[in-house]
């Protein structure tokens, strides 16, 4: 005697237990079904026939008992192997059709083949042939809502046959159809049975059940009648279904992994994700808004921070990285700061490491021209100023050595002073301005340099002879600080050491002075700007986090709305990882689209800021980083909903509303 294709021994199924009453749905089912049989399982509502079908189709597991499929104990199969059985051995035909609403008839039929790893061209051709065979050649692109009930059920049958459909499990296939459509569906099932498919028909209608060769009656979870009209063993030996059984047994022994399936599944996941996003366009747009704003904020904030940093660094660097500043400082809080004298400046000038040295005597002071007033930094310098700071004069000329010796009341004004006080004067050279009510004649205008650090504006200064500043304005001959140009920018530290050694000698070993250099100041400013950029980016990242929470929220809602679709995919052979991939792909797709749109918005905002003369510097690293963060956000916040979807029970998912 040939081994039955399906063999159930003392199958029991109970629900509840613990705090809830235990309900026994199946109470010891013994059933054998051979290849090629057409079996009808008949019973009233609540008899346990649907539960039996779910166990037969590997959608559910029995509480106890033994289920052998092609001689293999199903209890020993893991979830992936059960999915393989559903995909390769079974084809489901449901009373409610259970088609995916967003997919066309062709796409619904192709679904089992996608999970089986069948190449796209082959599955397209096979699905089209099945639909043509069932009279739906002109309806391949129609969605379920565009089909009649009979047409939807035929699509469901075509889907059941896509991977061979060795065993057709039809649960009340005519229950939702009119009599004419019902007869057409039953005729199709008769035809499939005659071709060797095992057809298991679940119904409460005895007239429908009469079409089967074998009728099994079930009541209160027990088989009360099994009326086989022929010897099933004899039928199996002469029926073409025996060949299908041999093929199934062979493939089951070879393994359940479908080679190359992931490619088709990934493409299907992307296409399905795009369809869902398009169908729910408004909701998708609202979800994307959070990601778009988050990515755009991160990119723009970092671009503004980087632009500000580069601008400040360029302006500070314009003064030279070989510049050293010397000023008096207090050795401790209880003593007054030291004083740097002009004699010490002369002594320092003799050091070979120094090319130029310039004392500065300056302070903020009020400046007037006509009826206009302005606050500016007044710096008493010598004629080394343009060379030390690489700061040319664009109008007129710099004051001379003679002006310095004579304490001449002449001034070279910065660009901002020119714009504030002499904007309407075509030629400022020769004009007189009042500095602390002392008249000075403008002899030159410095080139623009911009802000050097923070709120300081280097262009808001006026250079006058050191002697004039000391006598006419400040009443002190000692410099406020000294500017020193090192001979070699690469040896600024060595130059500082030489200056410090000489100053300690001049001050009898007392370090009541301070040395700083432009390079150190630039590095300190760079650290400050980096911290500022990081702070701006962190603030912007919060909005990206909010966008991620929005993705999680929408995906949780999507899982709830599409629970039945998840059940359909599982019934057609999807593994848990396939469902996980499907919903994770949708979350990532949201993030990818949002990331791309966010980058586009950031570039647009950046363009507007540039037109508004705000320093902006986009970085490919920052853009790529923001996009990567959006992608990671999609994965992280989409994983929990996707895992929830993957862990759904197939039966529970299929019966959800």
Swiss-Prot record:
SUPFAM superfamilies: P-loop containing nucleoside triphosphate hydrolases (SSF52540). It is found in: Cell inner membrane. Its EC number is 7.6.2.-. ATP binds at residues 43-50. Residues 6-245 form the ABC transporter domain. CDD domains: ABC_MJ0796_LolCDE_FtsE. One of its GO terms (molecular function) is transmembrane transporter activity. SMART domains: AAA (SM00382). Part of the tripartite efflux system PvdRT-OpmQ, which is composed of an inner membrane component with both ATPase and permease domains, PvdT, a periplasmic membrane fusion protein, PvdR, and an outer membrane component, OpmQ. This is Pyoverdine export ATP-binding/permease protein PvdT.
């Amino acid at each position: 005697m040939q081994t039955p294709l399906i063999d159930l021994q003392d199958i029991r199924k109970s629900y509840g237990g613990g705090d809830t009453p235990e309900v026994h749905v199946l109470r010891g089912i013994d059933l054998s079904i051979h290849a090629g049989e057409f079996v009808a399982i008949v019973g009233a509502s609540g008899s346990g026939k649907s539960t039996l079908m779910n166990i037969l189709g590997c959608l559910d597991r029995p509480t106890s008992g033994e289920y052998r499929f092609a001689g293999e104990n199903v209890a020993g199969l893991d979830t992936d192997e059960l999915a393989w059985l559903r995909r390769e051995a079974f084809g489901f035909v449901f009373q409610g059709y259970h088609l995916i609403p967003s997919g066309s008839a062709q796409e619904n039929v192709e679904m089992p083949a996608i999970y089986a790893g069948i190449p796209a061209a082959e599955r397209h051709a096979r699905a089209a042939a099945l639909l043509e065979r069932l009279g739906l050649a002109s309806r391949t692109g129609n969605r379920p809502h565009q089909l009649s009930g009979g047409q939807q059920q035929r699509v469901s049958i075509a889907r059941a046959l896509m991977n061979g459909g060795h065993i057709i499990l039809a649960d009340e296939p005519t229950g939702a159809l009119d009599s004419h459509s019902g007869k057409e569906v039953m005729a199709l099932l008769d035809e499939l049975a005659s071709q060797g498919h095992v057809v298991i028909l679940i119904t409460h209608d005895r007239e429908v059940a009469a079409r089967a060769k074998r009728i099994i009656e079930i009541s209160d979870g027990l088989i009360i009648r099994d009326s086989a009209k022929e010897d099933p063993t004899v039928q199996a030996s002469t029926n073409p279904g025996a060949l299908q059984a041999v093929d199934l047994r062979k493939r089951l022994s070879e393994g359940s992994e479908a080679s190359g399936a992931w490619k088709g599944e990934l493409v299907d996941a992307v296409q399905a994700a795009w369809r869902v996003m398009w169908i729910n366009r408004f909701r998708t747009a609202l979800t994307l808004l959070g990601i778009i704003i988050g990515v755009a904020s991160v990119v723009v904030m970092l671009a503004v921070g980087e632009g500000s940093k580069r601008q400040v660094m360029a302006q500070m660097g314009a003064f030279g990285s070989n510049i050293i500043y010397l000023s008096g400082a207090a050795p401790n809080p209880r003593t007054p700061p030291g004083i740097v004298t002009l004699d010490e400046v002369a002594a320092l000038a003799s050091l070979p490491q120094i090319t130029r040295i310039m004392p500065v005597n300056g302070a903020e002071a009020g400046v007037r021209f006509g009826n206009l007033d302005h606050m500016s930094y007044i710096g008493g310098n010598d004629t080394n100023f343009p060379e030390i700071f690489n700061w040319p004069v664009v109008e007129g000329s710099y004051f001379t050595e003679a002006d310095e010796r004579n304490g001449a009341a002449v001034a070279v004004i910065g660009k901002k002073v020119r714009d504030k006080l002499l904007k309407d004067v075509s030629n400022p050279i020769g004009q007189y301005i009042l500095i602390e009510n002392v008249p000075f004649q403008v002899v030159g205008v410095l080139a623009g340099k911009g802000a050097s650090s923070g709120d300081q504006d280097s262009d808001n200064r006026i250079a006058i002879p050191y002697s004039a500043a000391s006598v006419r304005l400040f009443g002190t001959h000692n410099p406020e600080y000294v500017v020193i140009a090192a001979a070699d920018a690469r040896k600024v530290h060595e130059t500082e050491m030489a200056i410090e050694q000489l100053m300690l000698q001049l001050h009898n070993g007392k370090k009541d002075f301070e040395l700083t250099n432009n390079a150190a100041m630039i590095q300190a400013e760079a650290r400050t700007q980096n911290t500022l950029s990081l702070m701006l980016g962190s603030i912007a990242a919060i909005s990206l986090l909010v966008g991620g929470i929005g993705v999680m929220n929408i995906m949780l809602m999507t899982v709830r709305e599409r629970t039945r679709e998840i059940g359909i995919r599982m019934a057609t052979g999807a593994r848990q990882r396939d469902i996980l991939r499907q919903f994770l792909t949708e979350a990532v797709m949201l993030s990818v689209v949002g990331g791309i749109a966010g980058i586009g918005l950031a570039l647009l905002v950046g363009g507007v800021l540039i037109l508004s003369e705000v320093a902006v510097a986009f970085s490919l690293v920052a853009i790529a980083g923001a996009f990567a963060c959006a992608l990671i956000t999609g994965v992280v916040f989409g994983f929990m909903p996707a895992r929830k979807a993957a862990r759904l029970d197939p039966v529970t998912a299929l019966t959800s509303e």
